[in-house]
Amino acid sequence: MAVRKVRCPQCGKDALWAPENPWRPFCSERCKQIDLGCWASDSYRIPVPDDSNEPGTDPDPTSRA
């Protein structure tokens, strides 16, 4: 099986996609830890669809009286 090279999502360097690379898809432990830190500090977020039309939701929380 041929070893694939992929771009490290953190720094953009080539990284091996193989069992020999324990940090895949990252090129190094450092890049893996930087990425984990970004998730932990909320630098990365997964977009959530706007559910304002869903029953039971208050579209404007300041309108409560």
Swiss-Prot record:
PANTHER family: DNA GYRASE INHIBITOR YACG. Binds 1 zinc ion. GO terms for molecular function: DNA topoisomerase type II (double strand cut, ATP-hydrolyzing) inhibitor activity; zinc ion binding. The keyword Electron transport does not apply. Interacts with GyrB. Belongs to the DNA gyrase inhibitor YacG family. InterPro entries: DNA_gyrase_inhibitor_YacG, Znf_NHR/GATA. SUPFAM superfamilies: Glucocorticoid receptor-like (DNA-binding domain). Transmembrane segments: none annotated. It comes from Dechloromonas aromatica (strain RCB). Inhibits all the catalytic activities of DNA gyrase by preventing its interaction with DNA. Acts by binding directly to the C-terminal domain of GyrB, which probably disrupts DNA binding by the gyrase. Disulfide bonds: none annotated. GO terms for biological process: regulation of DNA-templated transcription. Signal peptide: none annotated. Keywords: Metal-binding, Zinc. Its cofactor is Zn(2+). Residues 43-65 are annotated as: Disordered. Pfam families: YacG. The keyword Metal-binding applies. Zn(2+) binds at residues 8, 11, 27, 31. This is DNA gyrase inhibitor YacG.
